[in-house]
Amino acid sequence: MTPADLAELLKATAAAVLAEHGLDSAALPAIVTVERPRNPEHGDYATNLALQLGKKVGANPRELAGWLAAALVAKDGIAAADVAGPGFVNLRIEASAQNVIVGDVIAAGATYGASGELDGRRVNLEFVSANPTGPIHIGGTRWAAVGDALGRLLSTQGAEVVREYYFNDHGAQIDRFTNSLIAAAKGEPAPEDGYAGTYIADIAAQVLAKEPGALELPDAEMRETFRAVGVNLMFDHIKESLHEFGTDFDVYTHEDSMHTSGRVDQAIAKLRETGSIYEKDGAVWLRTTDFGDDKDRVVIKSDGQPAYIAGDLAYFLDKRKRGFDLCIYMLGADHHGYIARLKAAAAALGDDPDTVEVLIGQMVNLVRDGQPVRMSKRAGTVITLDDLVDAIGVDAARYALIRSSVDTPIDIDLALWSSASNENPVYYVQYAHARLSALARNAAELGVAADTAHLDLLTHDKEGTLIRNIGEFPRVLKTAASLREPHRVSRYLEDLAGDYHRFYDSCRVLPQGDETPGDLHAARLALCAATRQVIANGLGILGVSAPERM
């Protein structure tokens, strides 16, 4: 019996109890949940449903809890149901009902935890989208890890996810990048408002290798050559770094194409039709205040040049024409103002603003020996994705960046995350998987096979705790996906790894010496196989490897 199964039983039982006592069963919440008590002595699961219902149906919550407990204890699979406090019900599950979870996990394999919650939904997930003016910095690296994990997570719930990178190759930053490349190619210092770092000199040299006569071209041709070739080279490097980090995209959209293809003009024309556009002081404005923004936004500046939001409008319209039900934008800490702006843009274009979700990520800091690490050899001023991977590896980097809620700034201690110790969270989880893999190999050598035929023998409290936790995995994924919080998966895995290590220390899995393999060994091996599967599934969602040996 999984937590989801128990919740369904609880809801059905509560409906019957309410009807039996002449109370309104319509008061039942759409979703009924059970929780694991912090203190195991209070039971396997607990519910506050009677407290939720008491006032709504005009019943004393504790009395209602008593009726509910009496009805539940009569159900198959419920060993005990006790009333606690003002109206809580603590539940204990019969081992025979609980232990079937082990067989369910083994049968489902790599699909365990998946659901059809988002079947039929087409989701556009745009993340990283860094300017092609330098390597991916540490903030963008956080999005590369979290965005990829979120895409995997949404896919487990049935969504069709398209990962998209919006290539910001339009605007003043590209001009500054071009000027920096030309200066480096000429052996001159970087412009005051330009970009520094050895990567600029490297790309300038590559431009000259591809176009040896670039510096002799007329000025306009020279600039266009360095711009076009340099941007492509930089973006190739960005894509290579992301690929090696385990993050790939389905679609790359060029911002410049929004302007050159006429899609910006089309979006503005559509807004004129709806009356959402007006002119003032020689500029073209969008009435975003009509849709919740704090001020109207300039779309076309007084000099005739499009403002940044013009591209955003065209881009959103382009996404909706491609048939996405939901567009998720993952932006940096300095983009809070974009939330209302993007939602207002969607509404102005005649769409539901709830089809737009904006996630804002906070800063990432690196620490070594208690001191902040601020300088990159490659980029000159910022820490890059490649710097982080060089320091602690892909697995540790991804895990460290995913492990905390994106709205929380994080410090990454390079010494901790590169250590082979239980204090290193990714090592702790991966070691559990490696330990389980070694156990499976040793069992094979002894001729002992996992078997679910005698799961009723799993009665040790550490076995029960481990089984209940692997039963939580589908609910963890469902919650993490609905809240867009993949960090919940990593925290769950750490908790599960802890339960496994404690089980292993308390329950001998394999026969020793001349001991004959028995049904309990086979049942415990099945529990280990299920635990190993859940850890592998969870690490896969995070894009982190599940090593067989460590």
UniProtKB/Swiss-Prot annotation:
Similarity comment: Belongs to the class-I aminoacyl-tRNA synthetase family.
UniProt-recorded Gene Ontology molecular function terms: arginine-tRNA ligase activity; ATP binding
Catalytic activity of the protein: tRNA(Arg) + L-arginine + ATP = L-arginyl-tRNA(Arg) + AMP + diphosphate
InterPro entries: aa-tRNA-synth_I_CS, Arg-tRNA-ligase, Arg-tRNA-synth_N, Arg-tRNA-synth_N_sf, ArgRS_core, DALR_anticod-bd, Rossmann-like_a/b/a_fold, tRNAsynth_Ia_anticodon-bd
Top-level taxonomy: Bacteria, Bacillati, Actinomycetota, Actinomycetes, Mycobacteriales
CDD domains in alphabetical order: Anticodon_Ia_Arg (cd07956), ArgRS_core (cd00671)
Underlying gene: argS
Enzyme nomenclature, EC number: 6.1.1.19
Organism: Mycolicibacterium vanbaalenii (strain DSM 7251 / JCM 13017 / BCRC 16820 / KCTC 9966 / NRRL B-24157 / PYR-1) (Mycobacterium vanbaalenii)
Designated name of the protein: Arginine--tRNA ligase
